[in-house]
């Protein structure tokens, strides 16, 4: 009987050990699976988030590039218009405002120019999207960010300066044209010597036509265009934009 009890006790101890060992091993194994699963989920989620942020940054930079291209076209248009004012101003100043010493055909080509009032505008909606998003903090290239904010500041300065010229032109030329008689208006529209007799008899107009020739400092306009181009090229290179 004693031997039988010892045999039963030994078997029971083996069963307990086996059960105990299985429980510990199973717990560790299950815990490891859970931990690994959490890590995989976390890493996978992080990779998805990073990939999504990368795509969002690239899409936003593409919008900024397109916006700068549009601003570049507006810049080119207003510069082309201003160059005509500049040419007329240079022509008149070079002849000391003695317009009858200038070939009449040369004056006629500018016959509508004195009534042209323009303004420069630019958009920064795409830049504002970037500034107001969390993406700004995710961009590691801080020099590029400075370049982008810098070019919009350049555009704003150019806008103020260019529109300052056309505001001046508007203030002088609108009252001048409103004060003309019908006969004077007809002569102005022909653009020949008689038109410039009328224009240059007005002191404000005489002073204004001298302005465009030296309105901007040398190479300023070209530098603005170059800065825009450099910003566009930097974006295209950094983010592989087509």
Task: Locate predicted features.
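N-terminal alpha-helical signal peptides/signal-anchor transmembrane segments
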Residues: 61-82
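Non-catalytic interaction surface on structured domains
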Residues: 4, 51, 56, 136-139
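N-terminal signal-anchor/signal peptide hydrophobic helix marking the start
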Residues: 21-35
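Soluble extracytoplasmic domains of inner/organellar membrane proteins
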Residues: 107-242
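Extracytoplasmic/periplasmic/luminal assembly and interaction segments
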Residues: 81-118
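Transmembrane signal-anchor/signal-peptide helices with a preference for the extracytoplasmic
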Residues: 38-59
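Transmembrane alpha-helices
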Residues: 11-14, 19, 24
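Short, small-residue-biased leader/transition segments that mark boundaries at the very start
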Residues: 1-8
């Amino acid at each position: 009987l004693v031997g039988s009890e010892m045999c039963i006790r030994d078997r029971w101890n083996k069963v307990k050990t086996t059960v105990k060992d299985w429980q510990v091993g199973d717990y560790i194994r299950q815990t490891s699976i859970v931990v690994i699963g959490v890590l995989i989920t976390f890493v996978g989620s992080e990779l998805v988030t990073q990939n999504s942020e990368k795509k969002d940054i690239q899409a936003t930079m593409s919008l900024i590039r397109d916006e700068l291209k549009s601003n570049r076209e507006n810049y080119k248009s207003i510069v082309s218009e201003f160059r005509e004012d500049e040419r007329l101003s240079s022509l008149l100043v070079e002849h000391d405002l003695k317009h009858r010493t200038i070939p009449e055909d040369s004056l006629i080509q500018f016959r509508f120019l004195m009534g042209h009032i323009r303004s420069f505008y630019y958009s920064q909606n795409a830049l504002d999207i970037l500034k107001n998003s969390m993406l700004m903090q995710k961009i590691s290239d801080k020099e590029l960010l400075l370049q982008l904010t810098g070019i919009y500041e350049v555009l704003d300065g150019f806008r103020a300066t260019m529109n300052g010229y056309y505001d001046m032109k508007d203030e002088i030329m609108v009252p001048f044209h409103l004060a003309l008689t019908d006969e004077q208006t007809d002569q102005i529209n022909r653009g020949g010597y008689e038109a410039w007799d009328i224009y240059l008899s007005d002191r404000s107009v005489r002073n204004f036509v001298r302005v465009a020739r030296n309105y901007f400092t040398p190479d300023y306009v070209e530098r603005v265009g170059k800065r825009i181009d450099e910003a566009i090229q930097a974006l295209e290179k950094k983010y592989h934009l087509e």
